[in-house]
Amino acid sequence: MMIFMAIAGYGLSVCAEEDQAIPYSATAIIPENQLNKNVSYFDLLVSKGEKQIVTIQINNSSNKKIKIKITPNTAKTTRNGTIDYSGMDLKNTDNLKYQFDKLVSKEQVVSIEPHTKKNVDFVLSIPREEFPGIILGGFYIREEKDEQQVESLNKTVQITNEFSMVIGCQLRMNEEKVPKDFQLNKVKLGTYGGYFSIISSISNVSPSLVSFYSVEKTIQDMNRKEIAKFKKEGISIAPNSIYEAPDKIEANKLNPGKYKMLLTIESRDKKNKWRLSEDFEITSKEKKGVQNEAIPSTKISNRKIIYLVTCIWFGLVILLLMILLLRKRRNRDR
């Protein structure tokens, strides 16, 4: 379970099981050069060549001593169209000049006594050259368990929650907005969640954050006949990052041959649109390889049939039991 105090939506999102207490919390100590004082993440106006200390306060609300690992990471974009600050193996664009994790001191592991607070300092080394837009990253915070704790958890059958938190950090040298710019790099077959899919590689090549945009895609054959259409809402893309956007599609709709992907990106306020296109080709070898990896459609329908038959069978058993009980009651009454 992860708690976000990040920038991908400009808010705080918390999800937790009601019966489980969160063992610790983390708070950004807001400095004087914070631009937006109403948010719980770092939004810093910085000057070139300076060094700055940023502080995160960890509060151990549990009854035991804990170790907390805090790792600075550069913001990237997941296949779901969300911002990731946890250090997942995702791609940034080639024109990303400064990675957040390279500008911050190394990750730290700190021990905190029960029911106490501890301040953890990180040093930001701001680039000597002025940069446009924003540099975006975050501090990924999670509990570090020792070997004994891990072994103990492995021996238990129960499912346990692992809590983690993210505090976002946005660096900028001015408040000027940078024009957004996108590129459609490559379109290829692949799998998503085990299903046969078409994957479009979309680059946000500007140092600006994309929040809650819509992405519409249309696949055409070379005769401009529409093969498939997709639309996703609420897409967020980190600055200078690549969004590998997957869409599930039936394999029989994409036979080997040449196609065109038409893509429209629209801003949240509907005021700006970007139209991109890319020709792509599907080979027999590529399609066969992806089909071998994907869940066969026959297997999916068989599962549905088994589920339906099982439900009907249980329904008939319950109905039969009810009839037998009613007959017994009638016999007793007689």
Model-derived features with residue positions:
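Intrinsically disordered, low-complexity Pro/Gly/Ser/Thr-rich segments with frequent PxxP/GP/PP motifs
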Residues: L90-E130, Q220-L254
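Beta-sheet-dominated interaction scaffolds and their linkers
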Residues: A28-S62, I66, V109, D181-G193
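Sec-dependent signal peptide cleavage junction
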Residues: A8-A21
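C-terminal membrane-anchoring or membrane-association module
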Residues: T310-R334
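Short solvent-exposed strand-capping/beta-turn motif centered on an Asx-Ser/Thr pair
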Residues: N59-K64, A75, E129, S203-L209
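Terminal connector regions
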Residues: K64-K91, S125-N174, N252-N292
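Short, solvent-exposed loop/turn segments enriched in Ser/Thr/Gly
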Residues: N38, G49-T55, K117-V120, P132-G138, ...
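Membrane-proximal extracellular "stem/stalk" segments
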Residues: R172-Y307
